Every structure is written in C-alpha cells, then in structure tokens.
C-alpha cells in the first residue's frame, strides 16, 4: 500500500523558498560564495565612480565590473551579445546586481572613463595572487617571462586584401623587370606599407605570427605558471614616461624591427613592474633571442637596475644565430662550453659550481675522458685521464675554470646546452600561450573598434579575469583550473 503524506501550506512554502534560493547555476554560486568583489576594488576606484559631483549612478560599480568579468569567463565576443545574455538570463542579471540592463554605450563609457582605476584593480589582484602562485609552485613563481604582441584594431589596413594587393603588385613588378630570386616581395611589401594606420597614427604596423597587421602594441610579463604579473600598453603616455626609448625608422626586415624594438622595451617594462610590486623579487628571467645583447645581460644580472641591489640571478636567453661566442682564454662551442684543445668537437664536462670568498661564482669544466680510480693505500678516489692523445701532462686531465662575471652573455648565471637549461627554457612558451589565451578566450581578438582607450581597457579586463580565475581555483582547492574555468562551466 502506498503511504500518503498530508501536504501543509508550510511545506509548500518551504519547498518554493528552497527552489528560489538554490535554483541558480552552480558556477555563479561558486563565484558568489568565494569571490568578494569589494575586497578587490580599491577605495579610490569607488570614490571616483561615486563622486559627489555629476549624476547619480543608475548602474552599480560592482554590477558593471562583474558583467565585464563574466563576459570574458564565458568568452562572449561582443558587448552587445553580453547585454543580450543579461536581458534573457535573470540569474545572471541578479548575480551581477543589475535591476535594469544598461545599453552598449554605458559599457564603452565605463571602460574609457575608468581605465586607470581598472589598472589599480589589476595591480591589486597581482599582489593578492602572488602567494597563491608560490604555494602552487615556488620555482615557477620565481620566474619572470616577457613577450610583446599587439591588439589588431578595426582599420582598413588590417583587411587581408590590403596586404595581398600590395604583394601581388610587387610580384608582377618583379616579373616584368626580370628580378632575380633574391628579391623578396614580402619584405618589399613591408617596406612600402605605411608605418601606421591612416585612421589613427597610434595604430602601428607590426609583424606578428607571420602576418602584417596594424595594432596597439603591448607587453606581457608572466611567471613560469603562465599567470599574468604585469601589462604594459605601449602608447604615447608610455613613451613620454620613458624618454630613454628611441624609436628608429623601420628597416626592410620585419623580424629584425620587432626584435630591436622589444629589446628597447624590456628594461623600462621590468622597471615599471618592480616599482609597482616591490615585494615581488623573482630571480630567474626567461626571454627569446631578441634580448641577446651584452648591454641587456649587464642590466638584467648586475647592479641596481630594479632597485637597491635588485637584479636577476639567472637569464635564460638563447644566443642570436647571427653572432657566436668567443673566449680569449680557451676554445668554446656554440653554448659557451670549453672544448678540448686537441679536438674542437669534444666539449669538456661541467663538474660543478663553486662560490669564492668574495661571493662570485666560478664554473668548473673537466676532461670528459677521465675516470675515478681508487688509491689502494689511502682508500680515496682520484681522477685519472685515459685519453690516447692527452692535451696536458697532468694525470687529472684538463681542468678549466670559467668566471661568469667576465662574460655575462656567455654565462648568464647558468650554462647553455645542459639539461637544466633545456628543461627551464621550455617554460618560456608559457607567455606565448598566455597571450594566445587572452586574445582568443578572453575576448581581446576581433574587437570591432579602433579606440585606444577601449582596447586598452579590454586588455586590462582580460588580465583581471585571469587573476580572478586564480583566486577562485585556489578557494575551491582545484589549482588545475588556474588558467581557465571552462571545465567548471560545462
């Protein structure tokens, strides 16, 4: 017999109340329970937004900021589509704190009017997430990786037909004049294109990922975990604040121009980063071959470049293929490792690092053709060279000491060609993956605007969203989600 239960009005009310309170998407509940947006927003931002002068705000600061963060978490490509989501989703609207959905112009004005305040939110989150990164992996959190890219603006010059038309004309010109095979129409096209977009002189020509484009250039600093630590937007204000940067005329080589420009931007960008976050003191720098210059090694590894006795201990930078290494004291291979005097193809074996009384390091290299032999009388082991053509009369074989401070380019606190170098330098790709992530997944690519402030704000908001991701992943004890929350949404 089926038992019957008498329903009371109180039970019906209780069920309805429970449904009303709990019928909310789980992901929004996670954000609501674990992220305190008031803790992240500086009081100066709140005072600026709710200034005593001007009109009363119809839309709360928290609501606007949450909406823009949600847009990037869900990879909603346009502001108009975000507003459509808000209009049709009551739970999303209530979570953000809107009683009425704003129009698109409100979103745009918010970005443009409060760009400096958004930067403060980002900087606040960097300090908040630093201990989280160290708790996840202290070694990778101590790394600093830099790379640059650009936000493509919505201008005529970024239409693929624009570059293709010029290249096609140059190919036809070369064919008509019987140019030899050394003529490169792509380099010629780069040289003939204008240095900036006609709509805005601040939208500069750049060669990114194998194609020509017109962009607002920016720089990204991440740690070894791929978490953003600093964003620099290379506009007129940045150049004014760093008069030491001299912008030269472009050459015929787009790759060369990018390398030269990146090398000039590195130290000013790092100085800005360490000035904003004096408690962050990473010891390892990773960069590509664009930074392979004696001047940069000296600034990165010695002196007070980033503060009182504040500099990197190691710099993982591959050698530029156009310039090799030379050592007046001994023969060295392409990685700076000393070679046997009788055989240039035989590198010596790294046998450890020692620190002298004055604190300076030296690297010890020994002949690879030695073995340790036990002395029967003393019971101790000693080196014995078994080379058929020894380069020295010493029984221990050739031993060479290298002093890194004499040549920081050859020995930037570490030794190229070793297993440690290979394993560490692979981590540098984290910054490239991060740039791709903020462009493709955090809605930075494909923005249909050429307004500098709007795109700058979009870049900062992408950084804010990634750091919010780190905070939430830490709160729910799932560090595998520090780069993306998409698995939690599905």
Briefly describe each language-model feature range:
Residues 35, 86-87, 329-366, 404, ...:
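Short amphipathic alpha-helical "interface-anchor" segments enriched in bulky aromatics
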Residues 255-378:
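An internal, acidic/charged active-site-proximal segment
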Residues 96-113:
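Major-groove recognition helix of helix-turn-helix-like DNA-binding domains
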Residues 112-285, 289, 294-302, 306-309:
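Polybasic low-complexity intrinsically disordered regions
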Residues 79-95, 130:
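DNA-recognition alpha helix
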Residues 1-45, 476-490:
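Charged, often Cys/His-bearing segments associated with DNA-binding zinc-finger transcription factors
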Residues 423-490:
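Basic, amphipathic alpha-helical segments enriched in Lys/Arg and hydrophobic/aromatic residues
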């Amino acid at each position: 017999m089926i038992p019957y239960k008498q329903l009371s009005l109180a039970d019906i009310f209780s069920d309805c109340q429970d449904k009303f309170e709990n019928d909310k998407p789980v992901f929004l509940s996670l954000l609501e329970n674990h992220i305190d947006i008031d803790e992240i927003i500086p009081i100066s931002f709140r005072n600026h937004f709710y200034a005593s002068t001007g009109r009363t705000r119809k839309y709360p600061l928290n609501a606007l900021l949450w909406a823009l963060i949600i847009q990037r978490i869900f990879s909603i490509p346009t502001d108009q589509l975000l507003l459509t989501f808000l209009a049709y989703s009551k739970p999303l609207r209530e979570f953000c704190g809107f009683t009425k959905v704003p129009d698109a112009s409100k979103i745009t004005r918010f970005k443009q009017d409060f760009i400096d305040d958004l930067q403060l939110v980002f900087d606040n989150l960097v300090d908040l997430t630093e201990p989280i990164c160290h708790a996840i992996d202290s070694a990778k959190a101590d790394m600093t990786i830099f790379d640059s890219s650009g936000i493509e603006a919505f201008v005529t010059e970024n239409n693929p037909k624009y570059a293709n038309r010029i290249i096609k004309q140059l190919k036809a010109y070369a064919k008509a004049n019987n140019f030899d095979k050394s003529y490169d129409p792509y380099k010629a096209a780069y040289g003939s294109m204008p240095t900036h977009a006609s709509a805005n002189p601040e939208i500069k020509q750049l060669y990114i990922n194998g194609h020509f484009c017109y962009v607002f250039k920016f720089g990204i600093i991440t740690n070894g975990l791929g978490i953003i630590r600093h964003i620099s937007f290379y506009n007129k204000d940045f150049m004014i604040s760093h008069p030491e940067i001299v912008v030269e005329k472009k050459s015929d080589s787009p790759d060369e121009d990018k390398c030269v420009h990146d090398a000039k931007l590195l130290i000013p960008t790092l100085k800005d980063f360490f000035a904003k976050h004096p408690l962050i003191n990473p010891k390892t720098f990773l960069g590509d071959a664009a930074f392979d210059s004696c001047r940069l090694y000296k600034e990165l590894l010695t002196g007070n470049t980033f503060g009182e006795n504040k500099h990197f201990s190691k710099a993982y930078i591959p050698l530029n293929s156009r310039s090799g290494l030379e050592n007046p004291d001994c023969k060295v291979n392409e990685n700076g490792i000393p070679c046997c005097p009788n055989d240039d193809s035989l590198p010596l074996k790294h046998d450890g690092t020692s620190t002298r009384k004055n604190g300076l390091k030296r690297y010890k290299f020994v002949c690879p053709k030695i073995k340790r032999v036990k002395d029967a009388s003393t019971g101790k082991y000693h080196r014995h060279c078994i080379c058929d053509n020894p380069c020295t009369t010493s029984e221990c074989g050739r031993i060479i000491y290298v002093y890194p401070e004499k040549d920081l380019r050859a020995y930037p606190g570490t030794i190229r060609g070793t297993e440690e170098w290979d394993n560490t330098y692979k981590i540098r790709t984290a910054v490239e993956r991060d740039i791709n992530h903020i462009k493709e997944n955090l809605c930075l690519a494909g923005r249909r605007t050429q307004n500098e402030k709007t795109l700058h704000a979009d870049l900062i908001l992408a950084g804010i969203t990634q750091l919010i991701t780190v905070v939430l992943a830490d709160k729910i004890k799932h560090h595998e989600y520090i780069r993306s929350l998409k698995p939690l949404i599905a």
